[in-house]
A protein has these predicted regions:
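Short beta-strand/loop motif that positions the catalytic acidic residue
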Residues: 219-221, 225
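Short substrate-entry loop that stabilizes the transition state in hydrolases
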Residues: 54-102, 178
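Short beta-strand immediately N-terminal to the catalytic nucleophile in serine-hydrolase-like folds
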Residues: 144-146, 171, 220
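The conserved beta1-alpha1 loop
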Residues: 62-68, 172, 221, 281
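Hydrolase active-site cap/lid region
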Residues: 152-199, 215, 226-237
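A domain-start/cap signature at the N-terminus of enzymes
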Residues: 1-60, 72-78, 139, 145-149, ...
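Cap/lid segment of the alpha/beta-hydrolase catalytic domain
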Residues: 95-119, 182
Length: 387
């Protein structure tokens, strides 16, 4: 655990970044609102997109926005609905509400929101069921992706409902179950501490009664991300290598490095890719975009010449392989990372929650732990990052 002085210093730096809501005024909103999808215990909003030419039995892609973002803005910048028109799949965008989190982050580490059949995870599952049942979508081709808090929540969905998903795409996210308290969340984002690789594997295996097959996972990360440390990408990969039985410390089946993109792939015994890590040199915190006509750059949506949208869909097998999003199109990432602000899942973004939180784990029980929690919460309020 970091020292209190270290935590307070980081709070001051985060305060200076002035993370505020990213408005979508003037942006094209291609999404419709999905209503009456279930009991919605997580109190989330649901948006969706279905093209007029959507084929019968089409795949479904669930997209989870990052902190300070909303569904329409993320779709505009990431270009998922453009690719949906091209490749023929439906889209579901769960959307966070301020009553749940002051800065519109999915609550990726709170026990009451990340367990099967509870909170935000159950709300998203209900949305998926409504979409599939209403529109006749393919239950064997359901995928989930997200950025930052959305990436961490995508990991939650893959772990808690593995039988639902054929694949996932985690961008600047964190391993499932790696944090359950405010101090732990701080540390994991910075790359400090966390469960060992075997424990990470067990967290997924214990999140449901599912025993396989498991979803394939595409992981994307910037090497210069100072919000979610790059070491989280390897932790996510190790978590899913263990689940897939590929070996916790197994070297990749093959690896390539070209013009700023290092791609590592782990395949099963049949040679089928199950896990990939895409590390982009010099890129900060955000979703990588390419020069392939999908989406548009903006805050935390970084034009580095590599389309993660197309790359993830290609890895899942729902987009053409002869696309323009290959690494050969890439440009140096560091200027973009420097020019655009980092989307920091700060305490105000990831950790502040206005509805009553679930009781924390035993590690925070007792007077000393409660005192430490109070000190950190006081520091958050002093920095203007928590109510």
């Amino acid at each position: 655990m970091r020292k209190i002085s270290d935590t307070i210093a980081r709070l001051a730096a985060m305060r200076a970044q002035q993370n505020t809501y990213i408005p979508t005024h003037g942006l094209s909103d291609r999404l419709s609102t999905l209503t009456d999808f279930g009991s919605n215990p997580g109190a989330l909003r649901a948006r969706c997109y279905l093209s007029d030419t959507l084929p019968e039995g089409a795949p479904l892609v669930v997209v989870l926005h990052g902190c300070t973002q909303d569904a329409a803005g993320y779709d505009f910048h990431a270009g998922w609905s453009q690719l949906a028109d091209e490749a023929g799949f439906a889209l579901l965008y769960p959307e966070q509400q301020r009553a749940n989190n002051a800065n519109l982050c999915f609550n990726w580490f709170l026990p009451g929101d990340i367990a099967r059949a509870r909170g935000e995870a159950l709300s998203i599952r209900q949305m998926i069921e409504s979409m599939v049942a209403t529109h006749g979508l393919d239950r064997k081709r359901i995928y989930v992706t997200g950025l930052s808090a959305g990436g961490a929540m995508a990991a939650v969905m893959l772990a808690t409902y593995p039988e639902v998903f054929a694949g996932g795409g985690i961008i600047a996210g964190l391993p499932f179950g790696s944090a359950a308290t405010v101090p732990e969340a701080f540390d994991r984002m910075r790359g400090h501490g966390g469960p060992c690789k075997q424990a990470l594997q067990q967290l997924v295996q214990r999140a449901s009664t599912h025993t396989g097959p498991w979803p394939k996972v595409s992981i994307w990360q910037g090497s210069a991300d100072h919000t979610v440390a790059a070491s989280n990408a390897e932790a996510i990969a190790a978590q899913w290598r263990g689940v897939h039985g590929l070996g916790l410390d197994q070297a990749p089946t093959h690896s390539t490095s070209e013009r700023g993109l290092t791609r590592q792939v782990w395949c099963d015994m049949s040679g089928v890719p199950k896990i990939e890590v895409n590390m982009i040199a010099g890129m900060g915190h955000g979703t990588p975009l390419g020069g392939d006509g999908l989406g548009a750059p903006g805050p935390y949506m970084l034009d580095v010449g590599i389309s993660s949208t197309r790359g993830i869909a290609r890895f899942w097998g729902i987009a053409k392989t002869d696309d323009k999003g290959a690494s050969a199109q890439s440009r140096p990432a560091s200027p973009i990372g420097k020019r655009l602000p980092s989307l920091a899942p700060t305490p105000s973004l990831e950790l502040a929650k206005t509805r009553t939180a679930e009781p924390s784990r035993a590690g925070l029980e007792g007077s000393h732990a409660q005192g430490l929690k109070k000190v950190i919460e006081d520091a958050l309020r002093a920095a203007g990052l928590m109510r």
